[in-house]
């Protein structure tokens, strides 16, 4: 017992500062940068909502951080221990679903960046997908750190770009954001969907959990998310200021693809400093998309194989390529980066949130817990509901509040199943 306690203490070595940086870095990627650039260019200052939602999500983690830190295991293991192996497998599978949206966003971001060098849209999409699949099949080792450093370098260049156009754009852009009314067709519904989905995904996402449980103390597990949230708020403000200022200055004039805002800003800043430097500054966005996309693709493939969801003759290579083809098809639909990311977030959150809340209630309440059958049925029905709404709205660009619809379908179907278990308990025994 002493050895086990000593091992746990060794694993729990992350200070709140390092924890905050780790949590912030999970959200801070191409979806955050290129996706926000696209959204601000298209929708104005309110396009920064997704970036701010990631920060609010980390701040909200404070509520559940002590629970995660104490119990250590991921959601699917906790629920599986309580409701059985089937529930564990369903929740674990769903926890990987939202990553498809992340891979698709990397393809879109990388391809749009590659297109500014003269390559066509389709060849760019296919090329980035092929590179993601290729890197998913090899052990990159320390290359993953290089991709991270490239992202940090690009961020530093963006900060220099902001200083170049003028720091006065910070208060100007914030004033514009605060004075932007949340009115118009579906604007409030769209904003609510992005905010609610992103916050809940952050609270329930196992990417964040894996770092949280390694916090040195329970206090560190609380301070870490607060620090990480603060970092993302600062980055969101700087990003909004840069993009808003660049648009108003005419630095993004002539852009035909809104996803190219960030790469074009990097390119033009580099060219203003030294001819040819712009290419070197914009190219890392392409490389980061490939590196990040392959990393997530590996996790998806490993999750599918670990859960034994496919026949034994289907190996890792096939799963990686199939995942790549699926996300390539998603990227061809013409959706925005943030729309794709948040829609897949909504499938996971909409399917798992209510059963997870029921688990938390059952764990602490003295009343009779929900049966294994009821929880399993709730997960299955909510998964089908969210998937159907996702598919039915996938080919329409006239539904900006898709995430809210997906969430609503999942929440309502789960609640109906649990309500029916009270009305007709014999059916759920």
Predicted region positions:
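Hydrophobic alpha-helical segments and their helix-loop junctions in multi-pass secondary transporters
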Residues: 103, 107, 111, 116-126, ...
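A generic transmembrane alpha-helix motif of multi-pass inner-membrane proteins
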Residues: 1, 373-429
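Helix-loop-helix module between adjacent transmembrane segments
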Residues: 53-142, 197-198, 283-295, 312-316
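Select transmembrane alpha-helical segments in multipass membrane proteins
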Residues: 14-23, 52-56, 85-98, 182-193, ...
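Transmembrane helix-loop boundary segments of multi-pass membrane transporters
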Residues: 38-51, 80, 107-124, 141-150, ...
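Extracellular/periplasmic helix-exit of transmembrane alpha-helices
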Residues: 224-265
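Extracellular loop-to-transmembrane helix junctions
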Residues: 1, 10-14, 38-77, 230-233
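Membrane-interface "cap" regions at the ends of multi-pass membrane proteins
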Residues: 1-34, 141, 160-161, 185, ...
């Amino acid at each position: 017992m002493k050895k086990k306690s000593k091992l746990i203490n060794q694993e729990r070595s992350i200070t709140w500062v390092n924890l905050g940086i780790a949590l912030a870095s999970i959200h801070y990627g191409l979806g955050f940068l290129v996706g926000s650039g696209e959204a601000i260019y298209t929708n104005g200052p309110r396009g920064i909502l997704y970036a701010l939602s990631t920060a609010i999500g980390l701040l909200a983690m404070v509520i559940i951080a002590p629970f995660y830190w104490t119990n250590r295991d991921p959601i699917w293991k906790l629920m599986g221990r309580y409701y059985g192996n089937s529930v564990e497998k369903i929740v674990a599978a769903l926890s990987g679903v939202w990553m498809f949206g992340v891979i698709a966003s990397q393809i879109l971001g990388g391809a749009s960046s590659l297109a500014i060098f003269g390559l066509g849209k389709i060849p760019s999409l296919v090329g980035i997908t092929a590179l993601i699949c290729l890197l998913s099949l090899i052990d990159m080792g320390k290359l993953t750190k290089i991709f991270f450093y490239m992202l940090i370098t690009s961020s530093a260049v963006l900060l220099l770009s902001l200083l170049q156009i003028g720091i006065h754009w910070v208060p100007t852009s914030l004033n514009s954001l605060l004075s932007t009314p949340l009115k118009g067709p579906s604007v409030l519904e769209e904003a609510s969907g992005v905010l609610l989905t992103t916050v809940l995904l952050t609270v329930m996402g196992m990417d964040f959990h894996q770092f949280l449980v390694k916090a040195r103390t329970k206090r560190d597990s609380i301070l870490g998310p607060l620090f990480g949230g603060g970092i993302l708020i600062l980055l969101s403000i700087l990003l909004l200021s840069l993009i808003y200022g660049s648009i108003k200055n005419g630095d993004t004039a002539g852009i035909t693809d809104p996803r190219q805002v960030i790469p074009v800003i990097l390119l033009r800043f580099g060219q203003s400093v030294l001819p040819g430097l712009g290419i070197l500054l914009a190219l890392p966005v392409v490389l980061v998309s490939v590196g990040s996309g392959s990393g997530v693709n590996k996790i998806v493939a490993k999750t599918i194989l670990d859960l034994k969801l496919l026949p034994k003759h289907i190996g890792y290579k096939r799963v990686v390529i199939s995942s790549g083809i699926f996300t390539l098809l998603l990227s061809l639909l013409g959706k925005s980066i943030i729309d794709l990311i948040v829609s897949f977030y909504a499938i996971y959150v909409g399917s798992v949130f209510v059963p997870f809340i029921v688990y938390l209630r059952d764990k602490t309440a003295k009343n009779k817990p929900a049966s294994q059958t009821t929880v399993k049925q709730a997960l299955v029905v909510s998964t089908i509901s969210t998937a159907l709404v996702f598919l039915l709205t996938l080919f329409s660009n006239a539904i900006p509040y898709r995430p809210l619809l997906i969430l609503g379908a999942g929440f309502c179907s789960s609640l109906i199943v649990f309500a029916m278990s009270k009305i007709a308990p014999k059916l759920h025994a």
